[in-house]
Amino acid sequence: MADVSERTLQVSVLVAFASGVVLGWQANRLRRRYLDWRKRRLQDKLATTQKKLDLA
């Protein structure tokens, strides 16, 4: 194995950790946005269906 200095190891671990945090944060934001969109869409569908039933 190549001789890796302690500093390089610390920096690489820090970079890996930071990228994992950022990636997880972005993925969670995306998931939240998707769930909010789905909820809104289903509520709109429900409202239109209820309107149709009321008119029938």
Swiss-Prot record:
Membrane topology (Mitochondrial matrix): 2-9
Gene null: resulting phenotype: No visible phenotype. Mutants are viable and develop normally with no overt phenotypes later in life. In the fed state, no effect on mitochondrial respiratory activities in cardiac or skeletal muscle fibers but, in fasted mutants, skeletal muscle fibers and left ventricular fibers show significantly lower rates of maximal fatty acid oxidation relative to wild-type controls. Left ventricular fibers also show reduced mitochondrial calcium retention capacity.
Distribution of this protein across tissues and organs: Enriched in heart and skeletal muscle (at protein level). Also enriched in adipose tissue with lower levels detected in liver, pancreas and brain (at protein level). Higher levels in differentiated myotubes than in satellite cells.
Compartment(s) of residence: Mitochondrion inner membrane
Membrane association type: Single-pass membrane protein
Keywords recorded for this protein, A-Z: Membrane, Mitochondrion, Mitochondrion inner membrane, Transmembrane, Transmembrane helix
Complexes and interactors: Interacts with mitochondrial trifunctional enzyme, a heterotetrameric complex composed of 2 HADHA subunits and 2 HADHB subunits. Interacts with cytochrome b5 reductase CYB5R3; the interaction is required to maintain cellular lipid composition and leads to stimulation of mitochondrial respiratory complex I activity. Interacts with ATP synthase subunit ATP5F1B/ATP5B.
Family: Belongs to the mitoregulin family.
Role: Positively regulates mitochondrial complex assembly and/or stability. Increases mitochondrial membrane potential while decreasing mitochondrial reactive oxygen species. Increases mitochondrial respiration rate. Increased mitochondrial respiratory activity promotes myogenic differentiation which facilitates muscle growth and regeneration. Increases mitochondrial calcium retention capacity. Plays a role in maintenance of cellular lipid composition through its interaction with cytochrome b5 reductase CYB5R3 which is required for mitochondrial respiratory complex I activity.
Protein's UniProt name: Mitoregulin
Lineage per the UniProt record: Eukaryota, Metazoa, Chordata, Craniata, Vertebrata
